[in-house]
Amino acid sequence: MSDGLDVIVLDDDPGISQVLKELIETFYSWGEVVCFSKAEKAIDYCLKRDTGVAIFVVDVFLKDMSGFFFLDSIENKFPSVHEDAIMISGKASEDVVDMCLASNVTYLLEKPIKPYALQLAVRSITAKYLNFAKKLLRDPALAQSISSL
């Protein structure tokens, strides 16, 4: 586990999971990119992490559970998991869009994934954390108040 902002990829197809990992690694340098094809292994990994911040790329329809159930299962460790998730689906129906809206998930990409769309979604989530880090660097009092939490 790195000290950076990692990307965690979960797709029940190991080939797709690996391709997404490799694609993200071509443009992402702020942390590690790890991939899983089994939801339970991804949950175990996430719950054992030291930090509760990451970017998630998750398939909507997994074999053992829905991608939304996966997000819900790690929400105590990752309070912003829904806002930091990019959901992917082979068929982005109105029901899937409604589930994203109900879960506070902003990003939904349809397979086959367009590399630029994935890059923009990942960069958008990354920018949120980079902007917050800049605020902490410019405001020592804010940084001190947060560190005491």
State where each predicted segment sits.
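Two-component/phosphorelay signaling modules centered on CheY-like receiver
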Residues: 14-36
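Acidic, metal-coordinating helix/loop segments flanking the phosphotransfer/catalytic sites
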Residues: 35-55
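Acidic catalytic/metal-coordinating carboxylates
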Residues: 38, 66-69
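Short amphipathic alpha-helix used as the core "switch/output" element in two-component signaling
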Residues: 44, 68-81
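Alpha4 helix (beta4-alpha4-beta5 surface) of REC/receiver domains from two-component response regulators
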Residues: 69, 82, 92-107
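C-terminal output helix
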Residues: 113-122
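CheY-like receiver
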Residues: 123, 127-149
